[in-house]
Amino acid sequence: MSFETVEYSLNNAIATVTMNRPDALNALSLQLTKDLDAAFRRAIADGARAVVFTGNGRAFCSGGDLREMQSMWEKEGRIEAFLEDPLGALHGVIRVMRETPLPFIAAVNGVCAGAGVNFALACDIVIAADDASFREAFVRIGLTPDCGGTFFLPRVVGEKIATELFMTGDAVSAQRAVEIGMINKAVPAASLLDEATQLATKLAAGPTGSIGRIKRMMNASFSNDLTEQLALEHECQIESGKSTDFKEGVAAFFEKRPPNFTGS
């Protein structure tokens, strides 16, 4: 299966999904949205153990495709033509990213704006090129954030900084994004994909069942109270304790050798 606007590869159980509309700064057209959904689902079906998500060209993703939006607006005579079904499709992709147990690593190159920022934040770990920039740009064209921005950003930078970034639409450098906890780290642009792939390789070699359960617990931690979270931790620990990987991990510890985890 090939995709019109996405490049997909699977190597050593690592799926690399690359947005491929460089001339449009990887703006999220309806076709790109459909291709991302299909590519992420293919990674799951292919048995990938980690996903690297990036963009071709000088942008990770510049946000929604304003040209397509304007065209649909003019054709249908109402902006809802773009903001209903296509926006719902975008939100569906976000849910796939968050609900699959696979770890997602964003490798953010260059421009990252609007919905592109929120797609990056939907990943479990975000690595950026040191020349990348992040901008919650919605307000600059009179829109409000979507694609989970008001869910993800306050959780990583706090309410006040998130509110400022949403209301001003100001750009944030990669270095500043690290300082405020928006992303995990910034690396030289030339080594961005290597850094992301190395981390994906490390995660893919780990006990991916446990990693998936960690993701599930982290997703739930902001809505659960302490009692509920302790109960979920108990449930996940029991599941992990029954796994083959736990037995392998303990055996490797006592035998003083690296574990050979299989995800089972």
Model-derived regions, located:
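Terminal peptide-recognition signature
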Residues: V17, R21, L36, F53, ...
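Terminal low-complexity tails and localization/encapsulation signals of metabolic enzymes
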Residues: M1-F3, A251-S264
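Glycine- (often His-adjacent) and acidic-residue-rich active-site loop
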Residues: G55-V96, C112, D225
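Conserved CoA-thioester-binding segment of acyl-CoA-metabolizing enzymes
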Residues: M1-N56
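Crotonase-fold acyl-CoA enzyme core
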Residues: V6, R95-G209, I238, K242-S243, ...
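Short, charged, surface-exposed hinge/linker loops at domain edges
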Residues: K215-N224
